[in-house]
Curated annotation (Swiss-Prot):
Protein name: Transmembrane protein 266
Tissue specificity comment: In brain, present in the granule layer of the cerebellar cortex. Localizes on the post-synaptic side of glutamatergic mossy fibers and granule cells in the cerebellum (at protein level).
Entry's Gene Ontology BP terms: monoatomic ion transport; transmembrane transport
Ranges annotated as spanning the membrane: 103-123, 131-151, 170-190, 200-220
Recorded GO CC terms: cytosol; dendrite; perikaryon; plasma membrane
Keywords: Cell membrane, Cell projection, Coiled coil, Disulfide bond, Membrane, Transmembrane, Transmembrane helix
InterPro entries with a match to the protein in the record: Ion_trans_dom, TMEM266, Volt_channel_dom_sf
Substitution effect: residue 252 to A: Loss of homodimerization
Primary localization class, coarse: other
C-alpha cells in the first residue's frame, strides 16, 4: 500500500476535464486508499499474546494455519506435521476461545467443592445417612474432572508445540497443577479405593482458578486489538494525508505565485488603459482645432479628389507670412521683386487683384477681398480665373497657386474656351440654381456674374498685356512709346520669372504693346475698380 501511495504521489493523475479540481481528485484517492486498507489480522502472534476470544475461522484460521506451518518449518519442529498438520490452527483457536476457558473455570470451582465435601465425609466431620456412598460418587466425579483437565493440557502441548508450551511459564504452571492434583488421586484410588484421605491432595487444583484472568482477557483483548487495528488504520491514513498535505501546500504556493504574477499583469494593463483613456480624452481637443473653411468638393474619381486636396494644401498660406493688401506694394513687387517686409514667397510671378466670393458659405460677409494670385502660365492658351472653394483641371495642364492675407486661398487652371457656366463652382452643370436664395447669396452671385462678364471680354487674358503703367501716373496723351526705365524693369521681371521656373517654358507675362494707349488701359481698369471694391446692391 505504501508503494502504491508513493507511485501515486510520484505520478499524479492529470486534471479531469469537466471542472473537477485536483484537490477533489486527491481527496477521492485518499478515500479509496483508506477503504482498501484491510484490517489487521491475528497473524504471527505467540501463544502468550493471542486473545482468548472467538476469532473468525474463515479469515483468521487459514492465516494462522499458514503462519504456523511457516514457523514450524523455520524452527525445525516437524513432529506435529504427521499428527495435526493444518488442522492445528482450528484446535488452537478452540483452545484459546473464551467459552472453553469459562467452562474450565466452572469445572475448577466444581471440583474444588466436591473434593472439599469428600474430605469432610472422610474425616467424619460431616455425617448423614448414605454419606460414604455419596463420598464415593464425589470421588469419581472429581477424578473425571481432573482427567478432563489433563486431556486439555495434553491437547495444548500437541497443538501449540512442546517448545512454545514450555516457553509459556503460565501454561507450564497450569500443567504442573493438573498433574499434581491428578496423580495423588489416581494413586490413592488404586491403592485404597475411593475412600482415602489422600484425596485431599487434589485440592491443589484450586490454583487453576487463575483461568478467570483468561476469561477476562477473552472479552477485553478483542476490544483492545480492535482499537489497535483502528489506530493502525488511522496512522496509515495520517501518513497518506501528510503526503497529500505537502503536495497541496506546494500546489497552493505555485498558485499564489501565479496569482501575484497575474495581479502584476493586471496592474500593468490598468496603467495602459489609463494612458489610453487620457489619450482618448485629449483626442477631442485635437479634433476641435480650427481648420481651413475651404474644402475641395468635386465630383470625380478618387485620384482627382486627392490631387485637388494636395493643390489646396499647397495653396494654403502660411501663418507667418503676412502680405500687405496694398496696391503700392503690388506695384513695387512688379518692378522690384518681392519686398522684404511683405513676406510673400520669392517664386511669385504676378499679382492679380480680383474679388474672392465665398458662395458656399453665405454667413461670411460679402465684402470684396484682394487676393494675391501668383500665376504660372504657359503659352498654349492658358488663363487664370479666381474661384471659391474649388480646383478644376483642364486640358492646358497649368496649376495656379494663390496666397492671401485673409486666409482665403483660391486657385484654378482652366481652358480659355471654358464657358462662363463652368467657372461657377456652386452651380452644378446638370441642375440650375434654386429659385429662392438668401439675400447675401444673391449679392454674391451678382458680384461673381459682374466679375465674369468683365473677364469674358477677352477670351484669354494671358495673351493680353498686363501693363502696370496705367496704375501709375498717366503719361501725356501723345506719347506712344514707353520709357526706357519701364522697359528695363519689365525685362528684369520676365527674366526673373524664367529663371525661377526653369522647367516650364513660360512666356513673358507682361508684354509691352506700343500700339495700345496708356489712357485706354487706365480707363478700362478705372471702369472696373468700382466693381472690385464695392458690392452692388441687388
Amino acid at each position: 500500500m505504501a508503494l502504491v501511495t508513493s507511485f501515486n504521489m510520484a505520478n499524479p493523475q492529470p486534471a479531469i476535464e469537466g471542472g473537477i479540481s485536483e484537490v477533489e481528485i486527491i481527496s477521492q484517492q485518499v478515500d479509496e486508499e483508506t477503504k482498501s486498507i484491510a484490517p489487521v489480522q491475528l497473524v504471527n502472534f505467540a501463544y502468550r499474546d493471542l486473545p482468548l476470544a472467538a476469532v473468525d475461522l474463515s479469515t483468521g484460521g487459514s492465516q494462522l494455519l499458514s503462519n504456523l506451518d511457516e514457523e514450524y518449518q523455520r524452527e525445525g519442529s516437524d513432529w506435529l506435521k504427521p499428527c495435526c498438520g493444518k488442522r492445528a490452527a482450528v484446535w488452537q483457536v478452540f483452545l484459546l476461545s473464551a467459552s472453553l476457558n469459562s467452562f474450565l473455570v466452572a469445572c475448577v470451582i466444581l471440583v474444588v467443592i466436591l473434593l472439599t465435601l469428600e474430605l469432610l465425609i472422610d474425616t467424619k466431620l460431616l455425617q448423614f445417612s448414605n454419606a460414604f456412598q455419596f463420598a464415593g460418587v464425589i470421588h469419581w466425579i472429581s477424578l473425571v474432572i481432573l482427567s478432563v483437565f489433563f486431556s486439555e493440557t495434553v491437547l495444548r502441548i500437541v497443538v501449540l508445540g512442546i517448545w512454545d508450551y514450555i516457553e509459556n511459564k503460565i501454561e507450564v504452571f497450569d500443567g504442573a497443577v493438573i498433574i499434581l492434583s491428578l496423580a495423588p488421586m489416581v494413586a490413592s484410588t488404586v491403592a485404597n479405593g475411593p475412600r482415602s484421605p489422600w484425596d485431599a491432595i487434589s485440592l491443589i487444583i484450586m490454583f487453576r482458578i487463575w483461568r478467570v484472568k483468561r476469561v477476562i482477557d477473552a472479552y477485553v483483548l478483542p476490544v483492545k486489538l480492535e482499537m489497535e487495528m483502528v489506530t493502525q488504520q488511522y496512522e496509515k491514513a495520517k501518513a497518506i494525508q501528510d503526503e497529500q498535505l505537502e503536495r497541496l501546500t506546494q500546489i497552493c504556493q505555485e498558485q499564489g505565485f501565479e496569482i501575484r504574477q497575474l495581479r502584476a499583469h493586471l496592474a500593468q494593463q490598468d496603467l495602459d488603459l489609463a494612458a489610453e483613456r487620457e489619450a482618448a480624452l485629449q483626442a477631442p481637443h485635437v479634433l476641435s482645432q480650427p481648420r481651413s473653411r475651404y474644402k475641395v468638393v468635386e465630383a470625380g474619381t478618387w485620384a482627382e479628389e486627392t490631387a485637388a486636396e494636395s493643390i489646396v494644401e499647397e495653396l494654403r498660406p502660411s501663418q507667418e507670412a503676412t502680405v500687405k493688401d496694398d496696391m503700392n506694394s503690388y506695384i513695387s513687387q512688379y518692378y522690384n521683386g518681392p519686398s522684404s517686409d511683405s513676406g510673400a514667397p520669392e517664386p511669385a510671378v504676378c499679382v492679380v487683384t480680383t474679388a474672392a466670393i465665398d458662395i458656399h458659405q453665405p454667413n461670411v460677409p460679402s465684402d470684396l477681398f484682394s487676393v494675391d494670385l501668383p500665376l504660372k502660365l504657359s503659352g498654349n492658351s492658358t488663363c487664370a480665373s479666381a474661384t471659391s472653394e474649388t480646383t478644376s483641371h483642364s486640358t492646358c495642364g497649368s496649376v495656379t497657386r494663390a496666397q492671401s492675407a485673409s486666409s482665403q486661398t483660391l486657385g484654378s487652371s482652366t481652358d480659355c474656351s471654358t464657358p462662363r457656366e463652368e467657372l461657377l463652382p456652386s452651380k452644378p452643370r446638370s441642375s440650375p440654381l434654386p429659385l429662392l436664395l438668401p439675400p447675401q447669396q444673391l449679392v454674391a452671385e451678382a458680384t461673381v456674374q459682374d466679375l465674369m462678364s468683365s473677364l469674358s471680354k477677352d477670351p484669354c487674358p494671358s495673351h493680353k498685356a498686363l501693363d502696370p503703367a496705367p496704375l501709375a501716373q498717366p503719361t501725356p496723351l501723345g506719347s506712344v512709346q514707353t520709357s526706357p526705365e519701364l522697359e528695363h524693369r519689365v525685362s528684369l521681371f520676365n527674366q526673373k520669372n524664367q529663371e525661377a521656373l526653369p522647367v516650364l517654358q513660360i512666356n513673358p507675362v507682361i508684354h509691352l504693346q506700343p500700339t495700345a494707349g496708356l489712357e485706354e488701359k487706365f480707363r478700362s481698369l478705372e471702369s472696373k475698380e468700382p466693381k472690385l471694391h464695392t458690392v452692388p446692391e441687388a
